[in-house]
Amino acid sequence: HSGRDLVQNHLSFFVLNHAAIFEEKLWPKEIVVNGSVMMDGAKMSKSMGNIIPLRTAIRDHGADPIRLAIISSAELLQDADFNMESVSGIKSKLESLLDECSTLKKGEIDDLQTEDKWILSKTQSKIEEITEAVEKMRLREALHEILFTFESDLSWYQKRIQAKERKNVSGILHQINSTRVAMLSPFAPHVAEEMWEKLGNVELVSK
């Protein structure tokens, strides 16, 4: 894993040197490169004063929001445009999800109605789509599905159950949000563990 700007020198010689010195089974199988990280659309530079030390950013906002802001700004080969507005928005989204998890309790799932079957089917589809995106290193797409598209589906479901004045849906919401937290875990491991605990689990979600 390296920077895109090193393809024409260091990384090329890395491959050539291995091919010249070692037998084929020891040659590199794959090199993953990423783009540059911009700050508010501009190249990071000490002279411009737009560099935020990593320790400072983590201290002020937490590791998970910083990580998610970078991932959500671009796919792997693209330049990531980092900005504090995105960090604040993601931090707020994580706090909202954490609060929601604290209100949900495990419960029996009654006879499924049409909207229940719909949201459970959408959740299964999301698992497949997000898994495929992660396997193909489309991390921005995967994260967008977890944080935002998932939210849209849940919002539609909640409108349907409110219209019917249904009350006993905690079991379904708990199951769906447990799935969502499990998928969020590789991207935001710290807050995902907090959410998992709020959902009443004892073991780590990362297990």
Regions found by a protein language model. Name each.
Residues 37:
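Short aromatic-centered micro-motifs
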Residues 1-2:
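Short histidine-centered catalytic/ligand-binding loop motif
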Residues 49-50:
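Residue-level structural signal for beta-strand termini and adjacent loop
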Residues 44-45:
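Generic structural signal for well-ordered beta-strand positions
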Residues 29-33:
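Beta-strand segments within the central parallel beta-sheet cores of soluble alpha/beta enzyme folds
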Residues 5-15, 19-28, 56-207:
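Helix-rich, typically C-terminal accessory recognition domains appended to large enzymatic cores
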